[in-house]
Design a protein with these regions (language model features):
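Active-site anion-handling motifs in enzyme catalytic cores
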Residues: 1-372
Length: 372
């Protein structure tokens, strides 16, 4: 196919610690190039004015934190995906910038990741802009809810309205499908995160070596830890007879007294830490994804965030892969059960086929639209 496509999500090396949004964006670039030989425009959208941009750079890019070095390495990884897949990439901050990029576009795709979370509502993430003749679809967007929550009532009315312009909708969480069908009045499909759809050799080739002398447990908790976290990891340490714990958190304090806290690592180093860990302990969706891609033993420790409300991301991906027992807390931990990686791979392959069917059916909509 030679149709011209536009993909809108977030893919921002500035936010170097949000590894999931970077990896899903790189995966989407590869997927888009597989489905068209035409022009591909990838827009990384985040609404922020000049003052916020300047403040962000002043806060993050001083040499003393180590952030700058990781940022430069991560930006290099992103540029490699842009170059290898021949992508017209832009970071945009308002609708006026976006409209300039939609000329001769036949299909617009939004996704993946949590761009539809009600706390982040912005009509741009629903492709609620541009000419009505353009086909609009979502791929693996995450709105990890099963019901309307009190703090987001007003936002859901806006979401429902924005969904009306979508021609086809796919989301990442199966548990959210009935809810989004109610909001949109349309058929909704659940599909795999795009990181599962690309050749895993791509991820192996993106790994950056870190010199770590001893076996280690990798703890990645993006949104802070609770008081029971150290008890949970202590049990993991005893199970594996490992003392070396590497902790990476993006906000909040570490509850560990005898662990090495990592400040900033590049996206390639993040992949290395997952692949080579004896065990991964995480509350991150994409750390779970890459643990399964690399066949690294892992456990999920969910840390609720009251401000963001209900969040079904972890239980949904674990259920999809038959790994529900990996979601545990400090009072409930069975480390004796091994992961059946053959069963996991079979589940991934089944869902991968279903996901590609959705993508191919979406592409066929462009052909039908051109014939009219």
């Amino acid at each position: 196919m030679k149709s011209n496509l536009l993909c809108l999500s977030w893919l921002d090396a500035d936010n170097v610690m949000n590894y999931g949004q970077i990896l899903q964006g790189c995966a989407m670039m590869n997927i888009l190039r597989q489905i068209t030989q035409g022009k591909i425009v990838y827009l990384s959208y985040f609404s922020r004015g000049p003052k916020r941009i300047v403040k962000y750079y002043l806060d993050h890019y001083n040499l003393s934190t180590g952030h700058l070095f990781s940022y430069l390495k991560t930006r290099k990884t992103i540029k490699s995906f842009i170059r290898n897949n021949r992508i017209c990439f832009s970071q945009v901050h308002n609708e006026s910038q976006i409209n300039k990029k939609t000329k001769n576009i036949e299909l617009m795709i939004c996704g993946s990741d949590q761009i539809w979370h009600p706390q982040n509502y912005d009509k741009i993430y629903f492709l609620d802009f541009g000419d009505d003749s353009i086909i609009r679809t979502s791929y693996a967007v995450s709105l990890p809810k099963t019901q309307i929550e009190k703090q987001f009532i007003g936002v859901y009315h806006q979401i429902s309205y924005s969904l009306r312009r979508m021609n086809a909708i796919s989301v990442r969480e199966k548990g959210s499908v009935p809810f989004i069908e109610t909001l949109s009045g349309k058929k909704v499909y659940d599909v795999l995160d795009p990181t599962y759809l690309v050749d895993r050799e791509i991820w192996y080739n993106s790994i950056e070596y870190i010199k770590i002398l001893d076996d280690y447990i990798f703890v990645y908790i993006p949104n802070g830890m609770d008081n029971k976290m150290s008890e949970f990891v202590d049990k993991i340490k005893k199970r594996y007879c490992i003392l070396n714990v590497l902790v990476l958190i993006t906000r909040g304090d570490s509850c560990f007294l005898d662990a090495t806290r990592l400040k900033y690592v590049s996206v390639g180093q993040f992949l290395y830490l997952i692949k080579n860990a004896r065990c991964v302990v995480t509350s991150s969706f994409h750390a779970v994804v890459f643990s399964t891609i690399f066949h690294s033993d892992f456990f999920c420790y969910d840390v609720p965030n009251p401000n963001r409300g209900e969040d079904i991301r972890l239980i949904d991906i674990l259920s999809k892969l038959g790994l529900q027992e990996r979601l545990v807390n400090s009072d409930m931990l069975d480390t004796s059960k091994r992961i059946d990686w053959i069963a996991v791979e079979n589940a991934i392959e089944k869902n991968r086929c279903y996901s590609w069917n959705f993508i191919n059916n979406t592409i066929s909509m462009v052909g039908k639209n051109n014939d009219q």
